[in-house]
A protein has these predicted regions:
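Aromatic "clamp/platform" in nucleotide-sugar-dependent glycosyltransferases that forms part
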Residues: 180
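Nucleotide-activated donor-binding/catalytic signature segment of Leloir-type glycosyltransferases, i.e.
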Residues: 146-160
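A short, active-site helix/loop in glycosyltransferases that binds the activated sugar's phosphate group
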Residues: 42, 53-97
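A charged, aromatic-enriched C-terminal amphipathic alpha-helix characteristic of glycosyltransferases
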Residues: 236-262
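Short alpha-helical donor nucleotide-sugar binding micro-motif in glycosyltransferases
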Residues: 167-172
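A conserved mid-protein helix/loop that constitutes part of the nucleotide-sugar donor-binding site
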Residues: 107, 111-130, 139
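Conserved acidic donor-binding segment of nucleotide-sugar-dependent glycosyltransferases
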Residues: 202, 213-222, 230-235
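Short hydrophobic beta-strand element within catalytic cores of glycosyltransferases
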Residues: 188, 197-200
Length: 262
């Protein structure tokens, strides 16, 4: 019987169903599963204790057959498995052209991503209502009518247009990633590629790695305001540091992945 080789992109109930069907028909399966974030924490944030247990079942069954490819070793229960580590990137030459000078008169904050509990967006919205500084927050994701009414907060529909995404970074001066759990978020590389500093909270401090231009804040309004103030005051110096980053390209990432799964 032929061995069915597969590459699974993340562990989800839907992917597990396809996985189970393949096992039923092919019996012998091997390959890889890419883990971009800590599913245990994500399912726990969304569904509580039972969410973690459901994910644990899927995790153990899939990793019996597939070898994990991870973007960070900060994944729960990973120590029990042999794994490969890669650094994903979507950065092309387009990201490194026509830089725009930021407006620093006030904090123009940006978040790009899903509007979900585990992404920390609701937490961020609560924090900024206590701000004493002038700010504007742009959220690019699923647009929801009457989601949050505030003159300083604007919602935009998600987009796959690189040109539009770049314009969002260029029209703001700080990117905030408020997630409770992350692996290797591509938005960090995008923001740094456009010379825009990034703020994350202490729960995902590991994403900083050796990258310059990433700042870690406690999850409270006072510390976040202090971090924003420091960035705006030292913006030119921070941009000079960001330029020293060696950001992996999408081409390099794709070549590394192809070599790994061959």
């Amino acid at each position: 019987l032929n061995v069915q080789k597969i590459l699974m992109i993340s562990i989800t109930p839907y992917n597990y169903i396809i996985f189970a069907i393949l096992i039923f028909f092919h019996k012998k399966i091997n390959g890889f599963v890419i883990l971009r974030s800590d599913g245990f924490k994500e399912y726990g944030a969304k569904f509580g204790f039972f969410g973690e247990k459901i994910y644990e079942i899927l995790y153990k069954k899939i990793l019996k057959k597939l070898k994990p490819i991870v973007v960070t070793n900060k994944i729960s229960n990973l120590k029990d498995y042999d794994y490969h580590k890669i650094s994903p990137s979507e950065i092309t030459d387009e990201w490194k052209k026509n830089f725009k000078k930021p407006n620093l008169k006030k904090a123009n904050l940006l978040y790009i991503g899903r509007i979900r509990k585990e992404k920390g967006v609701y937490s961020l919205l609560k924090l900024i209502t206590d701000f004493s500084i002038k700010y504007k927050l742009s959220i690019v994701g699923q647009k929801k009518k009457n989601f949050f009414i505030d003159k300083n907060i604007k919602f935009y529909n998600e987009t796959s247009s690189i040109k539009k995404i770049i314009s969002f970074y260029d029209s703001n001066n700080i990117f905030i990633l408020p997630s409770y759990t992350e692996g290797y978020p591509k938005v960090i590389l995008e923001s740094l590629s456009r010379l825009r500093p990034v703020i994350v909270f202490n729960e995902i401090s590991h994403v900083k790695k050796n990258l310059k231009g990433i700042f870690i804040s406690q999850r409270n309004a006072n510390d976040l305001q202090k971090t924003i103030g420091y960035i705006l005051k030292n913006y030119s110096k921070i941009q000079s540091q960001i330029r020293k980053n060696k950001i992996l390209s999408r081409k390099k990432f794709q070549n590394d992945l192809i070599k790994l799964i061959k």
